[in-house]
């Protein structure tokens, strides 16, 4: 007897539903979210490994020697300042200042340079004269180019002379110091481009630039070291709304650059600046400065360049910028000038000042590249002696020797293993470029002596154990550095 039709259909539907259930794709497993943080430094910053830090410390030490040789003292200021302290000091570059989030207290910003904090320090503490250097980090929201030494966090090395002194004497010393520092760090041939802010303003006035456009046009001229005149002129006319004929007059001036005395004589002979009080005063000051620089013997490094503008608003006198010649890898490696009105912005009394900043990060970039090309070996530590044991069970003897070395002011290391293998100890000393090793074995213990080996020539001698540190110092003094 056949099954009822209804029952047949029901059975088929039930079977289909079962089939669909069994053939349904398995539910996707939810991927576990990773709690790992991406490890990287913020844009425009970087870590420095021991090799890099060795180079940096050597350069810093050399620069400090120059600062101290000229009688400078050092100060320290906070890494962040009240925002109002920094506002209105940097012209168009003010947009690069890092503002800190308001935490319900004072509105602060990270320092943009070391000059403005120095001026605030002088005004706040009633300082009337000081010759100071300051090496510290500064911060800028710039577009970083790490390969060219442009960062958002970087070191500056500043030197400034604040106080009322005879005309151009401190200014000349600053330029001499830049020459000494750049020769000390051995970055190659360099040139210091020099101009006078009053002369630049006089040129603008002579050419017909409206007074309210001086700073804007100055900012445009400041780009001539990176951009051709056509682009700068376009900015002046189309962006700054300067008359094209006025821009063409400016070109005749800013295209002039020559040896200091030659260009000075040319400007006077042609009468290009006649009749302008600021120009006359600036040329007189520059003549005095060039005479002092001749006495110091550094005029071969100076280029009188009327296109040099320096965009910072606080400059009032001479301005200068050092660049490397014969290569286009980095921008300026030092810059500065006179700023007689900056301190007065913070206090009742003006304190004239002049100074400069070394572009230390760019110098580091150059030196690191050169070391890589030449495959130079760099000692990452200052260890002078490595203490080695020949046989087992001499850890206490090693510790006693190292202890005496440390007490004698000698930099020393040893293996942290109780019974290290001799080849491993020698390899450590060799790879770390440690110049001297002291070897202790059972025979040395019995004879109350030590074996000493100089690594540069592989010579080995035996010395007495008693008062051995005196002999070690003698040997170290003969090793080539």
From Swiss-Prot:
Organism domain of life: Eukaryota
Q: What is its main location?
A: cytoplasm
Give the location in the cell: Cytoplasm
Q: Note one Pfam family from the annotation.
A: HGTP_anticodon
> What Gene Ontology cellular-component terms does the record carry?
cytosol; mitochondrion
* Basic and acidic residues composition-biased segments: 12-31
Q: Which UniProt keywords apply?
A: Aminoacyl-tRNA synthetase, ATP-binding, Cytoplasm, Ligase, Nucleotide-binding, Protein biosynthesis
Query: Is this entry keyworded Aminoacyl-tRNA synthetase?
Result: yes
What the entry lists under InterPro entries is as follows: aa-tRNA-synth_II, aa-tRNA-synth_II/BPL/LPL, Anticodon-bd, Anticodon-bd_dom_sf, His-tRNA-ligase, HisRS-like_core, HisRS/HisZ, HisRS_anticodon
Spell out the CDD domains in the cross-references: HisRS-like_core (cd00773), HisRS_anticodon (cd00859)
Q: Which GO terms describe its biological process?
A: histidyl-tRNA aminoacylation; mitochondrial translation
Segments carrying the region annotation (Disordered) are 1-48
What this protein catalyses is: tRNA(His) + L-histidine + ATP = L-histidyl-tRNA(His) + AMP + diphosphate + H(+)
Database matches in PANTHER family: HISTIDINE--TRNA LIGASE, HISTIDYL-TRNA SYNTHETASE
What name is this protein filed under? Histidine--tRNA ligase, cytoplasmic
